[in-house]
């Protein structure tokens, strides 16, 4: 087996990735597969931090358009990410992987409050640390949270798991001739207006020199291939 090229990663999972073909909620089989793929990385001595979105359970921006206060909607979205985090922690524990769930705000009795030094300590002990509740502030996406936590824990890369094989020049679902990029610079992504993540998250990563790798988590074994340096997905640096 190839050696990992990253020592510490921040894995960003979208909430939608957890729902599978269900269209809503959490597909237990997908959750269990992801837990086993993360377990593989731990066995390779890779330190893993995880940020999960909440779009499979709740979308604050949609309700904001319907008249709900955006702050309230975003708070509800943050709680959805905590629910996903609880599910992921449970799946990891069932796979015999030590995992810790941290929330950006206090939720006594449910999970720990985010603490930077504690997170670093646990990562060094090869425990998976799941960061939930986004950044803890409204108006910021979970992509922003992933880049922020990645920078804070000094990860080597932010791995953005999606439903497509990487970054394309146009939507591959609408255009079968869409071209997949293997490598891009931050400037190219902005110039070509490619949809990698929202601009606030992307510029945060760019300003701190945090590489982003976009890949398809739907492909079994793709996470391991990304971490061992196979030409999987798109790298942005």
Curated annotation (Swiss-Prot):
Disulfide bridge partners, by residue number: none
Localization terms from the record: Cytoplasm
Keywords carried by this UniProt record: Allosteric enzyme, ATP-binding, Cytoplasm, Kinase, Nucleotide-binding, Pyrimidine biosynthesis, Transferase
EC id: 2.7.4.22
CDD domains from the UniProt entry: AAK_UMPK-PyrH-Ec
Binding site for UMP: 54, 74, 135-142
Major site of localization recorded for this protein: cytoplasm
Top-level EC class as recorded in UniProt: transferase
UniProt KW Cytoplasm keyword: yes
Gene3D superfamilies xref list: Acetylglutamate kinase-like (3.40.1160.10)
Annotated Gene Ontology cellular component terms: cytosol
Entry-linked Pfam families: AA_kinase
Reactions catalysed according to its record: UMP + ATP = UDP + ADP
Domain of life where this protein originates: Bacteria
GO MF annotation terms: ATP binding; UMP kinase activity
Region (Involved in allosteric activation by GTP) location: 20-25
One GO process term, biological-process aspect: 'de novo' CTP biosynthetic process
Residues bound to ATP: 12-15, 55, 59, 162, 168, 171
Regulation: Allosterically activated by GTP. Inhibited by UTP.
Family that this chain belongs to: Belongs to the UMP kinase family.
Task performed by this protein: Catalyzes the reversible phosphorylation of UMP to UDP.
Subunit structure: Homohexamer.
Name of the protein: Uridylate kinase
